[in-house]
Amino acid sequence: MSTTVIGPYEDDDPTEACSTIHHEVIGTTTCLSGGEDVPLAPLTTLKVGGPARHLVIATTHDELLATVRDCDRRGEPCLVLGGGSNVLVGDNGFDGTVVRVATSGLSAEVSSCGGALVTVAAGQVWDDFVVHAIEQEWIGPEFLSGIPGLVGSTPIQNVGAYGVEVGEFIARVRTWDRVDDTQRTFTADQCDFGYRSSRFKAEPDRYVVLDVTMQFNLGTRSLPVRYAELARRLGVEPGERVDTSQVRETVLAVRAGKGMVLNPNDHDTWSAGSFFTNPLVSPDQVPEGAPAFAQSDGRVKTSAAWLIDHAGYGKGFKVAEDAPASLSTKHVLALTNRGGASSGDFTTLARTVIDGVRDVYGITLVPEPRLIGCTI
């Protein structure tokens, strides 16, 4: 067995019974600075959001916990912000302290028979971790390539793509419980993972994720390809396994074609990704011709994108010709900032789409991003 330590992960002691120790940095470091009345728009992928009364950049677990606990003791509102890829912040900002999680580092115990048990700091950029996982021959994260945000956010939303969810790999999640003022570690079965849901999402202000431990098998061949569209792009049948690097390249190409890979020069990527979850409905609610995927509880998952498109809201739809927010020109499931959009522009667009789909199909779409200081 070998133990690998990457970056400044202060909660592991790399001197304990290690046969091999490596030190390196995953990805690049973004320079951020805190202060007073700091605009939050640059910290979100929608590029929307008013100022935080006070912004703290927490680069260590100690700094993160000290800031959160101090705010809680004083009764000051405190928002813990990850990569900003799944939030819509109101134009008035946040009247309190915003803590941007910027912790980093990774430790791994690897053995040929047991695979890799990998603990990653919450502030590590998710896609940088995916790149590293492929290099280390850890199987599974390749399907989740290109998803923006930080590792600590992935269990909250139980992020997923192309038939794979992060909850499949998670062994445990270490958190700070703000209600009980104590550290709590949850095993996978205690996380209540569901479709884009978890116990952490159910109580959004209670738990601060400190790190995530995941278990991976070893190899260069991917998990079986589950998603038909991806299998076609890979030139294989569903259920086949291919090189993990090939999966990543193809996933990135598919996501880029839908405007789902961040690009500062492409306004279609100024989004929160998929703005609505795919509805879970009874079989008799699925419109004729709509995709339908049976679930273990008897319900059916259908496509929010199909519903939006067939309700008359096509790519590039705006509520007005000069509106600065629109559906992506590449994919109707993303709401995008065309430049200068406010949170009000997004909530108006979202309400229009929700009401329209409900009027046509009787199905109410549910927004996926967390709403901070605004409502839909």
From Swiss-Prot:
Determine the domain of life of the protein's source.
Bacteria
> Where are the annotated coiled coils located?
none
- What GO terms fall under cellular component here? cytosol
The top EC class is oxidoreductase
Active site at: 196, 274 (proton donor), 368
Under InterPro entries, the record lists: FAD-bd_PCMH (IPR016166), FAD-bd_PCMH-like_sf (IPR036318), FAD-bd_PCMH_sub1 (IPR016167), FAD-bd_PCMH_sub2 (IPR016169), MurB (IPR003170), MurB_C (IPR011601), MurB_C_sf (IPR036635), Oxid_FAD_bind_N (IPR006094)
- Which positions fall inside the FAD-binding PCMH-type domain? 48-219
Question: Pfam families from the xrefs?
Answer: FAD_binding_4 (PF01565), MurB_C (PF02873)
The protein's required cofactor(s) are namely: FAD
Tell me which UniProt keywords the record has, alphabetically.
Answer: Cell cycle, Cell division, Cell shape, Cell wall biogenesis/degradation, Cytoplasm, FAD, Flavoprotein, NADP, Oxidoreductase, Peptidoglycan synthesis
Mind telling me which Gene3D superfamilies this protein's record contains? 3.30.465.10, UDP-N-acetylenolpyruvoylglucosamine reductase, C-terminal domain, Uridine Diphospho-n-acetylenolpyruvylglucosamine Reductase, domain 2
Q: What is its main location?
A: cytoplasm
**Which pathway?**
Cell wall biogenesis; peptidoglycan biosynthesis
GO biological process assignments: cell division; cell wall organization; peptidoglycan biosynthetic process; regulation of cell shape
List its EC numbers. Answer: 1.3.1.98
* Family, per entry: Belongs to the MurB family.
NCBIfam families, per database record: murB (TIGR00179), PRK13903.1 (NF010478)
| Role noted for this protein | Cell wall formation.
- Put simply, this protein is called UDP-N-acetylenolpyruvoylglucosamine reductase
Give the organism, scientific name: Cutibacterium acnes (strain DSM 16379 / KPA171202)
